[in-house]
UniProtKB/Swiss-Prot annotation:
Lineage summary: Viruses, Varidnaviria, Bamfordvirae, Nucleocytoviricota, Pokkesviricetes
Gene Ontology terms: cellular component: virion component
Known role: Together with the penton and the other minor capsid proteins (M1249L, p17), forms a complicated network immediately below the outer capsid shell, stabilizing the whole capsid. Plays an essential role in the formation of infectious virus particles. Especially required for the formation of the capsid vertices. During virion assembly, associates with the membrane and probably mediates the docking of the penton complex to the inner membrane, where it recruits the capsomers to form the penton core.
Claim: Membrane is one of the keywords in the record: no
Assigned protein family: Belongs to the asfivirus p49 structural protein family.
Induction behaviour: Expressed in the late phase of the viral replicative cycle.
Species whose genome carries this gene: African swine fever virus (strain Badajoz 1971 Vero-adapted) (Ba71V)
Superkingdom of origin organism: Viruses
Name of this protein: Minor capsid protein p49
UniProtKB keywords: Late protein, Virion
Location in or out of the cell: Virion
Amino acid sequence: MYHDYASKLLADYRSDPPLWESDLPRHNRYSDNILNSRYCGNKNGAAPVYNEYTNSPEKAEKGLQLSDLRNFSFMLNPQHKNIGYGDAQDLEPYSSIPKNKLFNHFKNHRPAFSTHTENLIRRNVVRTEKKTFPQVASLKGTQKNCLTQPSSLPSLKNPKNSSVPSTRFSEHTKFFSYEDIPKLKTKGTIKHEQHLGDQMPGQHYNGYIPHKDVYNILCLAHNLPASVEKGIAGRGIPLGNPHVKPNIEQELIKSTSTYTGVPMLGPLPPKDSQHGREYQEFSANRHMLQVANILHSVFANHSIKPQILEDIPVLNAQLTSIKPVSPFLNKAYQTHYMENIVTLVPRFKSIANYSSPIPNYSKRNSGQAEYFDTSKQTISRHNNYIPKYTGGIGDSKLDSTFPKDFNASSVPLTSAEKDHSLRGDNSACCISSISPSL
């Protein structure tokens, strides 16, 4: 079905790739072809919307219309076509978007992926009429109202009862409350087949996916509500920030655990210990323990082929580069942490030294949170939060049981993974495998 649908979309492709896709390799122009051949009026090989050589200079200057953008709004959300292009109320129904600003416009209002990750995901997403890239909405709200109680979270076991929107947030998005977004509540469930690692034979990705993108990918996998995503990534509600009430942090982690089915790690420290550097360090480490459990649940307990994960080395880098050395982490926490890491590490092939970025919270724009650029700002400049640790596989500081010549190819596959490998179908292993009920 995947190949048939792709062939149908690509049949009438006649134009050069659009500006925002020009950095992708020419052997896989799937997204370009969708945008040009079907959703931008170029169905029958006619001149593309971007044609600068048209006889109508006015048309050339005008570029894409918002009405054209709505034609492929399924990339954001097919049910709410006015959401995802910034504040919908600020745009006239058919206001033009100059083509030279189109790329920046989308970059600011789509999921906060880095260019590398966005290209990776855009290249490997199967888009059909009922599948969606979760939309980014700029909505009004306040920090105090952004909690989601566990009882309101949909259950993975019964996804048909899901009524919580899959809203994506960029760094530029303000806090929100569910009262602000009644239009975004969806009925039923949206199936997702985001292929995170399918690629051409022999092709490898250099570098790694930035820290925050791992959480975005994780939330894509589970279709998590935005407030739960904030709990996972430690973003909207800053986990470990001494200025945030501890019960908010506890509720967010509880919501995350309830939604993903991952057990809680235990109670927070006493209230008299929930301030200052020690608590920040404890909370940050505790948060990574919880994330390790969630990633373990998503990637290690489901039939995702190791070769898929090899293309996302940052997951390995993140989990193996953080060592719980805080004096507030007792032996039970460390044991639980290492069990998850040891289970996950064999799924990966390579390791990169990595330091985790942390949020930089600013009062600008009434509660908006700013975040360090992964490539520029790292934890090494803020050692009072998490001890910097750049060890990896084979590093005795991490775990003395790992051989220095460790090779992931020697790890035996599970029966489900063997089945996928025998089929030789890259597209067979996708995020929808995480929850067969979807």
